[in-house]
């Protein structure tokens, strides 16, 4: 069977593409490589049945062409930055998330493709009244542009599913970490490692350090998606994906400092409950639905973060262990 993975050169997308290819599927990856990397697909490029298309989902003709012969779409492409930076265009998330999702759905409708798996986010919930939060919680009120546009994507998917007889799986991810998620500023782990490589004596931490969230390894996120697509067969299937525990930012800082072999690091907190405007300070997903289906993460949040730290440091072990400044 032929599968299309949008954003398939990204951290999660490339793991998904590899998993699909490993089980014998033909895989088409469509990625504009703005944040994804060809090297993430190094083991797939020469594989029979694999094809990489460098293109953007805003190009409707290219999206339509990429879907030729495809039987199912895994739509992971999106703006990867949850944090809004003042001065940036406010329509970036709308364009890259919602409008591009519409382009995917419309191309599927024209091509007669009925199955879609979509990577959503815990950010759609906003600040929950109680934790952990289940999939059927009261109507979400996101507090970030990223979360708002992902929620709009879910609405489009639900509408297309109902109107045009599609089948869809929506996955609301916890914070996903892994060996490919290393860019500074993209994750708290990458940010801490970068800062400590620049100055091993102090570490600036956004917020008060008490922010706590659930963390999931990329490979386990992919495994959960594939498991649910195989086992859950409602017309519209929505799952939280994560662990049943959480980890604080302060604890992650301690883990990074210890892994880098540093001592006496001074923590400097910027203050406030959240790390930035639109950040949800404390969040825990109720993962009972995916657990009852038969899937559970093998690693808890601390273990997932620990493995991600090890992988990040292994990329440049000499600089990382000594705290020597280096280029990001």
Locate the predicted segments by residue:
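C-terminal substrate-binding subdomain of Rossmann-fold SDR/epimerase-dehydratase oxidoreductases
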Residues: 7, 16, 198-328
